[in-house]
A protein has these predicted regions:
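Bacterial N-terminal signal peptides
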Residues: 7-16
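Eukaryotic scaffold repeat domains enriched in small/polar residues
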Residues: 19-357
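Bacterial N-terminal signal peptides that target proteins for export
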Residues: 1-7
Length: 357
């Protein structure tokens, strides 16, 4: 979308705001309570299981050199926010955590962008299954610090900067892969590779950093195609069903959480990913139950959006900032209900529990 389109939207803001109302909400101060001497780093993920336990994925246990340090920590809290345990301490797959999800059986899944791996834990915290392979420390040719232009061709079973997971009613797992391969992989409930779909690009079915993924009750997949500033909806075989774009006006003086105000026209002219553009989806989450809705977020102007599964914006909330009820790059959303969501923030090193009115 061209910058002039954003200008036009701003010009008709009063009418457009009426079509996409602002949602009133509250945020509980410090909903997760860490023990003395333990600290969060960047919060990259948050998930909630059937008992109401909250799982936070933090880049808080940094080890190694300042550059390319390992930083992944998976922490569990009970429904009151009391710390229970750390899961997978010193796990081989830990490098640079990306997202955490809970499947219908309360198994815990973590994607790690740095190690190119996906790990499935049991509810007790035991490793059940691993996907992908971490590069060998001595492997300079394909190691994590090397950037190939063009990137290496995708391989069956190998991920490159993997981002997220989702499941369909048949128990198949879908893995968004990711910053490099720009595709979605499908594996069955036994872990067998079935197929992949998507490739780098901006056309229908092509992807530019599939950053987050969620599935509805029918097994349709909602992929946060962040670099293309859209959500693409696929069926379980990878056929494109529709495209969702978020074009909600925002104040002209809206401040970014970090860096300069994004210039969409310049980004497009340079062929850059639209990661920081208004409406570019960083996270997607679909509520359970018979009447499902979709929540997503952008980095600028820093909002959460509530949508129907067909793509209608039902409302929005929040803005960029460092105070309670403001957001600093929401990286993942957990939505156990339509009225309660959890957001994990990179820049503010925190999780917020939001109650929508």
């Amino acid at each position: 979308m061209k910058a002039r389109t954003f200008a036009l939207l701003a010009a008709v803001a009063p009418a457009a705001f009426a079509q996409a109302p602002q949602i009133q909400f509250d945020s509980a101060p410090e909903p997760l309570k860490l023990p003395d001497g333990m600290y969060f780093g960047e919060l990259t993920g948050v998930a909630v299981n059937s008992k109401g336990h909250v799982f936070a994925l933090s880049r808080g246990n940094t080890s190694g050199p300042a550059y390319a340090a390992a930083a992944t920590q998976l922490l569990e809290f009970d429904q009151t926010g009391k710390f229970i345990r750390e899961i997978g301490k010193n796990l081989y797959a830990w490098s640079y955590g990306h997202t955490v999800r809970i499947d219908p059986q309360d198994n815990i899944w973590v994607t790690d962008k740095g190690s190119d791996m996906v790990v499935k834990f049991s509810p007790r915290g035991r490793v059940l299954m691993v996907f992908g392979r971490k590069q060998e420390a001595s492997d300079r040719e394909t190691g994590p610090l090397e950037r190939h232009k063009p990137p290496l061709a995708p391989e069956v079973g190998r991920f490159r900067q993997v981002t997220d997971v989702a499941w369909d009613p048949q128990g198949n797992t879908y893995i968004s892969d990711g910053y490099i391969n720009s595709r979605v992989a499908k594996v069955d409930k036994l872990g067998n590779w079935l197929k992949s779909f998507g490739e780098p690009g901006s056309g229908a079915g092509q992807l530019n950093t599939p950053h987050s993924i969620a599935a509805d009750a029918k097994g349709n997949l909602y992929v946060a195609d962040r670099g293309n500033r859209r959500i693409q909806v696929f069926d379980g075989e990878g056929n494109v069903l529709r495209e969702i774009r978020i074009d909600v006006p925002f104040p002209p003086d809206a401040k970014p959480a970090l860096g300069a105000t994004p210039n969409v026209e310049k980004m497009q002219a340079a062929g850059l990913p639209l990661t920081m553009a208004p409406g570019a989806p960083w996270a997607v989450c679909i509520t359970p139950g018979p009447n499902q809705v979709l929540f997503t977020s952008d980095a600028y102007p820093g909002r959460v959006y509530k949508l129907s599964l067909e793509g209608k914006v039902l409302g929005w909330l929040g803005e960029s900032g460092k105070q309670l009820k403001q957001f600093g790059w929401i990286h993942e959303i957990a939505c156990p209900s339509e009225k309660q969501i959890w957001v994990a923030e990179l820049l503010n090193w925190r999780v917020q529990k939001l109650t929508l009115k």
